[in-house]
Amino acid sequence: MVLIRVLANLLILQLSYAQKSSELVIGGDECNIDEHRFLVALYHSRSKTFLCGGTLLNEEWVLTAAHCNRVFMYIRLGMHNKNVKFDDEQIRYAKEKYFFRCHNNFTRWDKDIMLIRLNKPVSYSEHIAPLSLPFSPPSVGSVCRAMGWGQTTSPQETLPDVPHCANINLLDYEVCRTAHPQFRLPATSRTLCAGVLEGGIDTCNRDSGGPLICNGQFQGIVFWGPDPCAQPDKPGLYTKVFDHLDWIQSIIAGEKTVNCPP
């Protein structure tokens, strides 16, 4: 299952590498209808084009990747098949958007994260429920679950109507530094490295912003990966949710001064 990441013009200007526009899971299977109640879909309001995934944190907040941002966008919650609407599906708009502006000990690779406050609270239902933030850091070697409506083939673009899910492995960050020398990744980072080194399973375009769930905890946000997707020895990068907890929680709490992680 290939998760596809959505390219954002803002990050194209800021970053010297190419991101996937939205990533889809390659080498996976259709997600069980009950396993992604927290998974949301971001759409462009004018073109009605599917952009990215995201994760519902509570009745009012969604966490996704910053490069998924568009001026005009809406969020579908409780969706499985894009073309078949559940009775409890809900649509919301972004009331507020928050971007990570902290500079201390954070590089440009560590900031692809965005909090969206919805225009009105969501009602939990059979197909809509939140995903909790992690309570402990991720461990290298963990088996992680990736999911999204991104491409299922690469480089040919095949977009599914239903979300696909796949298991990938959480790898040592140094594996990604070695795999992608052209990007000169910093020696230390608050991003996660994950994939299947044998190839064939990966996130891909239009899965950006979706969750990476490791040992049952929400540990990563789909961020960047090689193109074509699912190449051997070419794992992808994921924003590390645990290292952004202070920032996330201070914004949701409505604090006037945002807490930057140490």
UniProtKB/Swiss-Prot annotation:
Gene Ontology cellular-component annotations:
extracellular region; secretory granule
Q: Which Pfam families match?
A: Trypsin
UniProt key word Signal: yes
* Propeptide residue range(s): 19-24
Q: Which residues form the signal peptide?
A: 1-18
Q: In which tissues is it expressed?
A: Expressed by the venom gland.
What InterPro entries has UniProt attached to this entry? Peptidase_S1_PA, Peptidase_S1_PA_chymotrypsin, Peptidase_S1A, Trypsin_dom, TRYPSIN_HIS
Q: Which CDD domains match?
A: Tryp_SPc (cd00190)
Enzyme class name: hydrolase
Q: Which family does it belong to?
A: Belongs to the peptidase S1 family. Snake venom subfamily.
Q: What role does this protein play?
A: Snake venom serine protease that may act in the hemostasis system of the prey.
Q: Can you name this protein?
A: Snake venom serine proteinase 9
The organism is Crotalus adamanteus (Eastern diamondback rattlesnake)
